[in-house]
């Protein structure tokens, strides 16, 4: 049977940047629209893009600092106003941009007295500082400051042990996430079977990438995830007839099918870090010393457990609980 008329949509899917702002060197905003989409597709794309933007876009950070003749993070340095800990926290705030991979070396060589800012960092050619006004330290005496830095480009985050100091080398908890936040919304139009949707994406970055660049990278990463499905299905995936040189899955399929204990919520909470909760520095440092690095770590503690954390006062605990209630509608249980 041949249909007399076949209705074919010739509309082309298009995207457009409808708003772009730089509120500061370290806060950029972009709003994008994608249309026309069939009903339901906007939500599918929006969920995937938000996750890719927040978790898959690469960033550049200072990951290690070397200070001569310093043994502890909370040591005081003669002639420098800040403690080692304060200097490390200031270095962590520096936003970098790099077009190359691998470990890069940088340094600071300054003679006091004077203020030291990000502008004083001697960088390799492939690395750029977004905001050179970031304060690092204040030298109060006529001393020489020689600081060595290690810079890496990566994705996600790296959490170091707070006591892992050797030969004056101090690792820094690095958050390789240039996208500070991402949201999406959907607008529907039309009626009946002709309903179509417009997807709006909002992206905030720290200046290490523009929102447009972050959108490109997240899109490429999503495409890469689906490329394997475009090739022929691998044979013998059940582990039978495993001949030398065959392309087998690198794990037992039965293990994957049964190991599904983690819930979606737990997976999401693993990727929310406590430095994103905007807690006061004293509260943040107390939680970090207790090896609480993510929201999932924090939710393993009851109210009473939080009260037992060293240097975490009752007022600080209340601040943590208030953030959990307002931002996540979570009320930790009592023992």
Swiss-Prot record:
Matches recorded under Gene3D superfamilies: 5' to 3' exonuclease, C-terminal subdomain, DNA-directed RNA polymerase, insert domain, RNA polymerase, RBP11-like subunit
Q: Which SMART domains match?
A: RPOLD
Location in the cell? Plastid, Chloroplast
Record-listed E.C. numbers: 2.7.7.6
Keywords noted in UniProt = Chloroplast, DNA-directed RNA polymerase, Nucleotidyltransferase, Plastid, Transcription, Transferase
- Catalysed reaction(s)? RNA(n) + a ribonucleoside 5'-triphosphate = RNA(n+1) + diphosphate
> Does the keyword Transferase belong to this entry?
yes
Q: Which GO terms describe its biological process?
A: DNA-templated transcription
Q: Does the keyword RNA-binding apply?
A: no
Q: Which Pfam families did the record assign?
A: RNA_pol_A_bac, RNA_pol_A_CTD, RNA_pol_L
The subunit structure is: In plastids the minimal PEP RNA polymerase catalytic core is composed of four subunits: alpha, beta, beta', and beta''. When a (nuclear-encoded) sigma factor is associated with the core the holoenzyme is formed, which can initiate transcription.
Database matches in NCBIfam families: rpoA
Provide the function of this protein: DNA-dependent RNA polymerase catalyzes the transcription of DNA into RNA using the four ribonucleoside triphosphates as substrates.
- Family the UniProt entry places it in: Belongs to the RNA polymerase alpha chain family.
Which named protein is this? DNA-directed RNA polymerase subunit alpha
The lineage, from the top, is: Eukaryota, Viridiplantae, Streptophyta, Embryophyta, Tracheophyta
Gene that specifies this protein = rpoA
């Amino acid at each position: 049977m041949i249909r007399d008329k076949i209705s074919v949509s010739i509309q082309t899917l298009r995207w457009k940047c409808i708003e772009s702002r730089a509120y500061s060197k370290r806060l950029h905003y972009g709003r994008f629209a994608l249309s026309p989409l069939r009903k339901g597709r906007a939500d599918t794309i929006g969920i995937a893009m938000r996750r890719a933007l927040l978790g898959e876009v690469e960033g550049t950070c200072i990951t290690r600092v070397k200070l001569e003749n310093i043994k502890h993070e909370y040591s005081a340095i003669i002639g420098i106003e800040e403690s080692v800990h304060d200097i490390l926290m200031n270095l962590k705030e520096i936003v970098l941009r790099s077009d190359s991979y691998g470990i890069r070396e940088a340094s600071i060589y300054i003679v006091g007295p004077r203020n030291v800012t990000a502008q004083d960092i001697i960088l390799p050619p492939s690395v750029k500082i977004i905001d050179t006004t970031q304060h690092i330290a204040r030298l109060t005496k006529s001393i020489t400051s020689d600081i060595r830095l290690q810079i890496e480009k990566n994705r996600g985050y790296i959490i170091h042990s707070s006591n892992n100091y050797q030969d004056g080398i101090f690792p820094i908890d690095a958050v390789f996430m240039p996208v500070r936040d991402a949201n999406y919304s959907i607008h529907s139009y039309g009626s009946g079977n002709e309903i179509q949707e417009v997807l709006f994406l909002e992206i905030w970055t720290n200046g290490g990438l523009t929102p447009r660049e972050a959108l490109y990278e997240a899109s490429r990463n999503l495409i890469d995830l689906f490329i394997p499905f475009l090739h022929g299905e691998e044979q013998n995936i059940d582990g039978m007839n495993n001949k030398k040189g065959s392309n087998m899955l690198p794990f037992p399929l039965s293990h994957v099918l049964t190991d599904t204990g983690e819930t979606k919520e737990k997976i999401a909470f693993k990727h929310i870090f406590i430095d994103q909760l905007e807690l006061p520095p004293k509260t943040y440092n107390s939680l970090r010393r207790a090896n609480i690095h993510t929201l999932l770590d924090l939710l393993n503690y009851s109210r009473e457990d939080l009260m037992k954390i060293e240097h975490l006062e009752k007022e600080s605990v209340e601040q943590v609980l208030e953030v959990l209630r307002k931002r996540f509608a979570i009320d930790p249980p009592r023992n």
